[in-house]
Amino acid sequence: MWRPCGSGTVYHDLGNVNYTYIVRANGTVDYDAVLSPVIAALNAIGVPARKNQTCDIAIGDLKISGSAQRMTKGRLLHHGTLLFSSDLGVLDQITTRRKNDCFQSKGTQSAICTVTNIREHLARPMTIEEFRERLLNRMVPP
């Protein structure tokens, strides 16, 4: 899927959790400001997440989340994906470049990286529904 705010390939399946922030902006793109609450929420529920050099969220060297931003009219739209229990085999198949690609992308070139599912790194098993609820409760004040 192509996003008007840039970034590379976005993969969606039933094991994927998406989030979006729309906030007032001061004219600068600040990934730390919007990724910090996501990372703090993940850490609070036992996911050892951190921001990597390319502003993705990772566990160690394995990517679990990508995101993109767009600023317009004093507002910042930031949205991201979280791989909870995605089918990584399908993800690999559709993101692997083939010699005979029949189209040329106008979007941002996707970075090649190794990914993992969050579920594999939890101290105790939980469903995607429980994960979503716990994440939301940590990211959004009551």
What do the predicted segments below correspond to?
Residues 1-29:
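N-terminal lobe of the biotin/lipoate ligase/transferase fold
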Residues 8, 57, 116-119:
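Conformational gate/switch positions in structured elements
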Residues 16-18, 54, 63, 77-81:
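Broad gene-expression machinery/nucleic-acid interaction feature
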Residues 51-69:
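Beta-rich nucleic-acid/ligand-interaction surfaces
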